[in-house]
């Protein structure tokens, strides 16, 4: 029973942390781009699914993961020995021009969007379904209630490198 409770707490925390930071990062980025905000104002429910995936791609809450090589390998011409640790830069992968058209631009209608903001494979975020659910409910609800929402001042980022998010975001409604 104790393991079950611990697993539930892990899932809730993983989903909550991912959704809070993805939502905050994505909303700030969108609020700074009038053409993207216009899409949300006009039809928040119509762009919710693609918008939340773009939030994860454009400014994911986690940009850096440490990984350990399980076999000797080579990546981009660099030899990596079994047991060696590497830093996987998710933020960089989500801006790969060979995968994404106009990768440095936010596009809330981007589809397909094969981002790895939630990780991939065996390292896929356990909280991803909860994060997607929370964002898919809150995004249209927020825009329907506050359609004139705008940034009131420059948001303040948390002073961390790995888990990206904001300490405060002041908005006007």
Give the residues covered by each predicted segment.
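Cytochrome P450
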Residues: 1-173
């Amino acid at each position: 029973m104790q393991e079950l409770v611990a697993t539930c707490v892990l899932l809730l925390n993983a989903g909550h942390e991912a959704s809070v930071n993805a939502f905050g990062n994505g909303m700030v980025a969108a609020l700074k781009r009038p053409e993207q905000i216009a899409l949300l104002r006009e039809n928040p429910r119509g762009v919710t699914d693609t918008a939340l995936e773009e939030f994860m791609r454009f400014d994911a809450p986690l940009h850096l993961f440490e990984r350990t090589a399980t076999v000797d390998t080579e990546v981009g011409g660099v030899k990596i020995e079994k047991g060696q640790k590497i830093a996987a830069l998710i933020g960089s992968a989500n801006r790969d021009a060979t995968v994404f058209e106009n990768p440095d631009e936010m596009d809330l209608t981007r589809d397909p969007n094969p981002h790895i903001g939630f990780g991939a494979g065996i390292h896929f975020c356990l909280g991803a379904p909860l994060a997607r659910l929370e964002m898919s409910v809150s995004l249209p609800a927020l825009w329907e209630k506050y359609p004139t929402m705008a940034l009131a001042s420059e948001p303040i980022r948390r002073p961390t490198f790995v888990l990206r998010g904001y300490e405060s975001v002041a908005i006007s409604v």
